[in-house]
């Protein structure tokens, strides 16, 4: 019979400690709501005694969360426990999580105590916390470097004192999977009352072992996994919960456990955490990276088109993604080109695949990735500057005021004759104003879907590179602009996107006319 693994999220406590700036109460609450929607069993949302701001955020989240258990961290000190209980008292379900170092190096060099004193502090603190709640978790800080005899001794004392959950952290990410699983096995062998508590693990990623150690702990009997969304956290980060959750789901045949997580919320939760914490997700990040369900190799693309299971061990819909991405690059084969043309509504008799594939490879070698509208242009036009630059920047002027409103005057060359069209608009900031003016001049009702700004050093200046995605009539179009002036780079990117849209419109018109003539 499969057993449940409790998912303990510490994004708002351990994860937040790694951020360059603290989250506001409002931002923390937004993340907490996302975690609750995801279905985490326990969310550790702060260290109440550490600051008035942390107390307020824990208190606010405790008042608003309905389903998940809300947890606060405390040292083995009465004052810490009192403050944590005060912050948590309005929660429907709450847990007090207390911790104490157990490794020789921490006890001697950090606390200047002996192990017997640690035992006494553990007993007293757990019993004291039990005055406020039956749900007390005790963590053996630096358990990964604690002697097994001492670890077994303190775990037994903690359970006898009333701790319902015993956490075994690999605080400095020192252990490797077979070593860490042996620690958990040893606890089950040597602590007679181990079945009276849930064994939890909290692994750090200093050697890249956090997820591996957590999985090995599950196999050894751990039934709570602590971690963070996207693996954010101190130093190299924590166990990435999305990876644990999907490993349990996909490899249930070996792990024989389950979680109560709503898997289809994983991607959205990851995005919320990334955006609010201002921590971009690496493209190759497992489960939630932009390349996680993307295929560029021609062999892989052909295999996926024939049967997704050839190269995909999970369905992207399981995490809330709608589709697999087959990127068009110089490594793509004819099958991928046909697939993208079919997605745009074209049949094989509409174009010559051999001719299209030749010019596609030339363009892919030049620019790396080719987008659908560029492929469409290759199929039905000579991919010339005439088509690429229907719109071109003549000049612009931006005037901003202290009220956060900005006025933009944009002058564009339009059409083959390069007639200048002008527009003046007001917006909330210079880029908003400029984009409104460009939309009015082009008469293309577009919506800005994504705006990314990257900086690069160029000679003695910092060059701003702007990447945008806009939507028009249900399709996405891209634009890139580079300049030492960020506003100009943004305008260049938008003009490129407008040119791509204009070109696609011309191709559609020409194709319809051709089809009409054939009939």
Curated annotation (Swiss-Prot):
Coiled-coil portions = none
Annotated Gene Ontology cellular component terms: cytosol
Cofactor(s) this protein requires: Mn(2+)
What is this protein's function? Catalyzes the condensation of the acetyl group of acetyl-CoA with 3-methyl-2-oxobutanoate (2-ketoisovalerate) to form 3-carboxy-3-hydroxy-4-methylpentanoate (2-isopropylmalate).
Limits of the Pyruvate carboxyltransferase domain: 5-267
Which compartments does it reside in? Cytoplasm
Q: Name one GO biological process term.
A: L-leucine biosynthetic process
GO MF terms held by the record: 2-isopropylmalate synthase activity; acetyl-CoA C-acetyltransferase activity; manganese ion binding
* Region annotated Regulatory domain, chain positions: 392-519
Q: What class of enzyme is it?
A: transferase
Q: What is its EC number?
A: 2.3.3.13
What reaction does this catalyse? 3-methyl-2-oxobutanoate + acetyl-CoA + H2O = (2S)-2-isopropylmalate + CoA + H(+)
Q: Which NCBIfam families match?
A: leuA_bact, PRK00915.1-1, PRK00915.1-3
So where does Mn(2+) get bound? 14, 202, 204, 238
Describe the protein's quaternary organization and the partners it interacts with: Homodimer.
Which UniProt keywords are given for this protein, alphabetically ordered?
Amino-acid biosynthesis, Branched-chain amino acid biosynthesis, Cytoplasm, Leucine biosynthesis, Manganese, Metal-binding, Transferase
Q: What is this protein called?
A: 2-isopropylmalate synthase
> Which family, according to the similarity comment?
Belongs to the alpha-IPM synthase/homocitrate synthase family. LeuA type 1 subfamily.
Species whose genome carries this gene:
Blochmanniella floridana
Domain of life of the native organism = Bacteria
Q: In which pathway does it act?
A: Amino-acid biosynthesis; L-leucine biosynthesis; L-leucine from 3-methyl-2-oxobutanoate: step 1/4
- A Pfam family cross-referenced in the UniProt record is HMGL-like
